[in-house]
Regions:
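Charge-patterned, long linear interaction tracts outside catalytic cores
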Residues: 127-141
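Beta-propeller and closely related beta-pinwheel folds
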Residues: 1-129, 144-171
Length: 173
């Protein structure tokens, strides 16, 4: 009986967003984030206790949907490809809204995003605060997103090669 679950039982919960959804990704960042075909949701985490059947809730946050490309924790947020394959979004908790927001990062650089197939990132370091996200498109091109959040600097650039990019991996120091 799911209704009488104890804290040590499995979590079985229905995500009630009014439409059929397939979960595409679970990402651990500030909270456990859920990216589906039509929505972005999260399971709030608690500093003093773990997730249990008695304290789990899943509020819907944004209505965009995610592609099959794995989301990336990036510069305090989570980057993901919107289900259309044309937009890179930043899923970030807004204290002002008391909710997660999904800001389109690639809006003015949409010509650099074409059905991404893979993403990787290099985190900042003590001597290098900037972070980079490498986005491989299905046409073999690569877009690179650069961000320094605390200085409010960010932007996309196209990386060119004589051939095509097939895959990308980032190895931090």
């Amino acid at each position: 009986d799911v209704g009488s679950a104890g804290d040590s039982d499995s979590i079985q919960i229905t995500i009630n967003v009014g439409e059929f959804n397939n979960i595409r990704h679970l990402t651990a960042n500030r909270d456990l984030q859920i990216f589906t075909t039509t929505s972005e949701l999260y399971i709030p985490s608690f500093a003093d206790k773990g997730l249990t059947p008695t304290n789990t809730q899943i509020p819907r946050q944004t209505p965009y949907g995610a592609s099959f490309v794995k989301p990336l924790p990036f510069d305090g947020a989570t980057l993901y490809v919107q289900k259309t394959g044309k937009t890179i979004r930043e899923y970030l908790f807004s204290d002002k809204e008391s909710a997660y927001v999904s800001t389109p990062l690639s809006l003015i650089s949409s010509h650099l995003i074409s059905n991404p197939i893979q993403m990787a990132s290099v985190k900042g370091a003590f001597d290098r605060p900037e972070q980079y996200a490498f986005i491989i498109n299905d046409d073999g091109s690569m877009a690179v997103f650069h961000s320094i959040r605390n200085e409010e600097k960010a932007g996309f650039v196209k990386w060119s090669t004589t051939g095509r990019y097939h895959s990308v991996v980032a190895i931090d120091d």
